[in-house]
């Protein structure tokens, strides 16, 4: 966002929407309508609020540009899938969105099957959400399924619960599943992951990571795995792992610590918005990140 927008709105959904609307008004004035709106965030609450506000503002101004949905830098594995399902599912269930992307730090072909599942379940999810909302008791949302695939259950539960948790209609989640294909611990872990993705309750570290592109000059998936393993014993951290300096500094600003590719074989480390170490050899970077985390934790204690 520009300094002008930041000074008036701050880093908020309102600022993101107004920044976008300024360009759309120019497009309308010039009768240029070949536009798709992609307005994303790695925070699902911000992402959902921003897209909703964008849709309302376009309607007020008589615009009807298509909306592209996605949770940017969602990560990888089941956490990346759940976070994407929470954000995208909340909006699809409200009839918003014309195209979607599930942004995963994995091979590109892994994204499409997940996106197809979200689209296929969207209408059913909207109906289930309406029914589930009526059953919320003392802030606890209970969802019941009969799934044999853990991934399918995770995606459906994340879509069904997302908007209700983001909007504060529930503050806890219980997931039930018929049969013995999915164990009770997996159901609890899924509920915890959904609560964290919706920013309701944090039970483990959060990792923000990009899907990688031609600018990424190190093995992103391998590095994410190494950082996750090295920080597994820590709690409550938000770590951004970004492939390059184009999007990296902006994304790490919202994280406690950032690991950003700087050049071939080189990495820079961030503590929030501040770059602490530049151009570290890649083979030393994970250990130096751990040292930075430990030093920061010691200063705060």
Predicted segments, located by residue:
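Beta-strand/loop-dominated core regions that host nucleotide or nucleotide-derived cofactor-binding catalytic loops
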Residues: 264-267, 274-298
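Short amphipathic alpha-helical patches
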Residues: 50-51, 114-115, 254, 275-282
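Nucleotide-binding motor/catalytic cores of P-loop/tubulin-like NTPases across gene-expression machines
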Residues: 245-251, 255-275
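Catalytic alpha/beta core domains of metabolic enzymes, predominantly
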Residues: 3-234, 238-241
């Amino acid at each position: 966002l520009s300094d002008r927008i930041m000074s008036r709105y701050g880093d908020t959904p309102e600022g993101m929407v107004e920044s976008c609307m300024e360009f759309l008004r120019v497009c309308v004035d010039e009768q240029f309508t070949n536009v798709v709106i992609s307005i994303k965030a790695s925070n699902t609450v911000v992402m959902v609020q921003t897209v909703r506000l964008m849709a309302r503002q376009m309607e007020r101004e008589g615009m009807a540009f298509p909306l592209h949905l996605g949770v940017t830098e969602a990560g990888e594995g089941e956490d990346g899938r759940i976070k994407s399902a929470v954000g995208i599912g909340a909006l699809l269930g409200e009839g918003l969105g014309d195209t979607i992307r599930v942004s995963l730090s994995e091979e590109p072909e892994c994204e499409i099957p997940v996106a197809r599942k979200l689209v296929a379940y969207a209408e059913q999810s909207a109906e289930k959400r309406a029914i589930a909302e009526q059953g919320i008791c003392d802030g606890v949302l209970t969802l019941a399924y009969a799934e044999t695939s853990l991934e399918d259950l995770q995606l459906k539960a994340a879509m069904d619960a997302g908007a209700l948790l983001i909007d504060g209609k529930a503050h806890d989640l219980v997931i039930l599943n018929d049969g013995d294909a999915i164990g009770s611990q997996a159901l609890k872990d899924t509920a915890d992951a959904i609560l964290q993705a919706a920013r309701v309750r944090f039970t483990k570290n959060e990792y923000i990571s990009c899907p990688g592109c031609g600018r990424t000059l190190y093995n992103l998936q391998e590095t994410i795995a190494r950082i996750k393993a090295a920080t597994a014993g820590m709690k409550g951290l938000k770590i951004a792992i970004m492939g390059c300096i184009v999007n990296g500094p902006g994304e790490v600003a919202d994280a406690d610590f950032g690991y950003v590719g700087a050049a071939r074989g080189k990495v820079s480390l961030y503590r929030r918005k501040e770059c602490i170490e530049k151009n570290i050899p890649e083979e030393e970077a994970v250990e130096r990140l751990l040292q930075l985390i430990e030093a920061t934790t010691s200063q705060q204690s």
